[in-house]
Amino acid sequence: MIRSFRDKALRRFFQTADASKLSVPNAARIAVILRALAAATRPEHMNLPGLRFHALSGKDKGRFAVDASGNYRITFGWIENDATDVDLEDYH
């Protein structure tokens, strides 16, 4: 389950399928990633082909990321069985 979002446009897209405020063009891929994240019970469940799941380091240690589109990643934390602070960001 997804407990919280950092990105308002991403939350709106997840709740209503309104992609008008997303900063990336591939809304269909974002939707697939968010559905997988909502169904996951461990961060490692996001280690799916093509997503390049990885743990972050440095100031973002304890967070994880998957490829979304181009330089954009969906990043998230994890508490118990839930994703938290889900964000869409270009951190490169």
Where are these regions (language model features)?
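Enriched for short, Lys/Arg-rich terminal
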Residues: 65-92
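N-terminal, well-ordered alpha-helical segments
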Residues: 32-35, 54, 74
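Short histidine-centered beta-strand/loop micro-motifs
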Residues: 22-23, 55-57, 64-68, 77
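Glycine-rich, flexible loop/turn motifs
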Residues: 1, 9, 18, 42, ...
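Arg/Lys-rich, positively charged N-terminal/basic patches that mediate binding to nucleic acids
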Residues: 1-33
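A short, surface-exposed loop/turn module that caps and links secondary-structure elements
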Residues: 41-64
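Short, solvent-exposed, low-complexity loop/linker segments
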Residues: 23-49
